[in-house]
Each structure stands twice: as structure tokens, then as C-alpha cells.
Amino acid sequence: MRCRVSLILFFLSLASLAAQDLTAVRELKQLWKYDEAIASLTQMMAAQGPRPELLEELADCHYQSGNSAEALDQYTLLARMQPDKLLFRIRLMSLFYRGKQYDAAIDIGRGILQRDSITQVLSLVGDAFNQQERRDSAEWYYRQALARRPHNESVLNKLCSILLGREQHDEVLALTDAFLAEEPDNLTILPVRGIARFAKKRYDDAEADFKHMNELGENGYAVHYYLGQCAQKNGLLRDAEREFKLAWQRDSTDVNVALTIAQLISDARKDGWEVWYDKALTMLQPDPKVISATATAHQNYALSAYKNGDFDRCIAEYKKMLEYSPKHYAAYYMIAQCYELKQDFKTALNWYKKAQPYFSEGSRGREIAETGIQRMEAELFFLNE
């Protein structure tokens, strides 16, 4: 009897220690000390075996710390061990979404929804379809999510983005009006309604939305850009110039803003419009690095075509290269050589003549061009052309 009592007390003490250890792990997690929590859990599993509650804590540590691969392995195992626990499947869905495995996220999400219509799951399935640009399916799930939780700004914003893309402005206005009637200061939905109002040419109403955002402390590019657009549409050109300049101060990457400011200043017969056109033209200049890389790509393509006897492709690629690098004069005699190999001696002669003046006397390029001209003239003489 004493032995049995001792065993019971022993196991109770082990259970108590395990509970204390688990409490300590959870405290570490609350302090975002996930590495320490994982180390403790690993030691506990070595001593106690892979108990489900330990595996769950370990999976959560990996999930919270962003270690998606380990979290995916752990939650896959847990979902097999406890198939009725939806939390594990929700985490799997989230991990697949994080990893851009959208089909897998959709499949798991649909399985969850057969058991429970969870708003967040509906939304995430919609997000997965949206990432795949399957807008109709995304719209359906967003609408289902809103049917269960109508006042959801995140889902409403995503649904309205789809509707704006289809120019369904009236429906966007109906949805956003209803939302803003309850929450008029919402900085997520106000700009959505403002854009829809602007698209419907309700410029005063659109201006009111963006001004309200500004009054609420929103002072970003989009606010001033649309205030500028509204002012311009209403003929308030000074106001438009001011707002577009404020937009430019916040984001100087939109060449159309620079062009608009230049036009507004010019139309007002004021000084300084040239500066804004210069800004715009500078922005419109292609990136020299991109030009160089593109020219090199066409040159390499041409050389490969030449080596493989595809002279038509070689000619086409050298001509494209000259669009990006017109001073690459060697391309002229390379094109000439291709036409020569195609026995199109007249065209070859023209290209050798084009190449000749670009090379100085005594240079290798000049020699290639001049001997090429001599050969082509001889060929044409024998052909009586």
C-alpha cells in the first residue's frame, strides 16, 4: 500500500513539475524569447516524450518567431494527431499563405469552412484567390465574410478594390456610405469613397472626403494628390498647384505630378515652369544601367545566332542592339558579314560602307570595312550588278 501511495505521489510531483515548466515556457513566449522557449521545450520532450501539449507550444514558438518551415512540420504532425482541432488547420492555412502556396491555403480553408464559417478564414481564402488574380472567387469569399461581420474595414477595403478595378463605382459608394455612416472618421474607408466619388465626377464630395482625412491628421501623398485633382477639375488652379506640390514633397517619383505642376505654372504665366519640365524629362530618361544591360543582351544573342548560322536572327538582334547602343560601330560590319554570308551582296555592301567612316585610318575596323567593300564590289561585278 505504501509503495502504491509513493508511486502516486511520485507521478503527481512529475506532473506538477511539468506544469511549472510549461508555465515558464509560456512566460518566455510572452517576453518574445522564443529561442529560449524552444530550448526548454526540446529538453522537456527529451525527458517526457513528444506530448501533444509540448508539440503545440513548440509549433506556436516557431510560428510566432517566423520560422515557417519548422512550424509547418509541427502543425502538419499535430493536425494528424488531433484532426478535429481547427486551430491546427487554421495555422497550416496561414503558413501556406505566408509561403505563397495559395492553392494549398485555399484547400485547407475550404475544409475548415465545411465545419465552421469563421470570418477570418473566409477572408484569408479570399486573399489567396486575390493573390492568384482570381477576382471573382475572391469577391465571393469577401462578400461571405462581410455577411457574417458587416463592419469589417479590412475585408470591405479589399472588396472595394476589386469593384473599383471593374469601375463598379455605384456599389462602392453604397458599401462605403453604409460603413462611414457608423464610423465617419475611418481612415481606411474614407479614401475608398473619395476615389469612387472622384470617378463619378462628384469632385466637391471627393474633396470633402480628402479634406476630412487631412483634418484627421492624414497628410500623405494620396490626400494631397486627390485634393489637387479635385481643385483642378473645379478650376481652382492655385489650390491645385499647391496641393500637387505638397504631393510631390511626399513622393517625388510620379512624373505625371511634375508635368501637371509644370503645366499649371505655365498656364498661369508664372516663372519656374521650366524647372518642372526639366524634372519630368530627367525622370523620363531611361536608366543607363538598364540600357547597357539590354544592349549587351542583344549583342550576346546576336553572337550566339552567328555562331549557330542563324544570320537572319543575328541581323535582327544587332539592329535591336543599335537602338540601345548606336555607337557600337562594330555591329555595322557584323551585319554586313551576315548579309554577305546570305549572298545578299548589295545589302552587305551598303552596311560595309556604313561602317567605314566610323573607324579611323589604320584601325582593325577600318580594314574590315574596306576589304569587305572590295569583296562586295568584286562579287557584284562578276554578277553584272
Question: For the regions a protein language model found, what residue spans apply to each?
Answer:
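N-terminal leader/linker segments that initiate helical-solenoid repeat arrays
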Residues: 17-76, 80-84, 97-100, 107, ...
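Register position in tetratricopeptide repeats
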Residues: 30-31, 64-65, 98-99, 131-132, ...
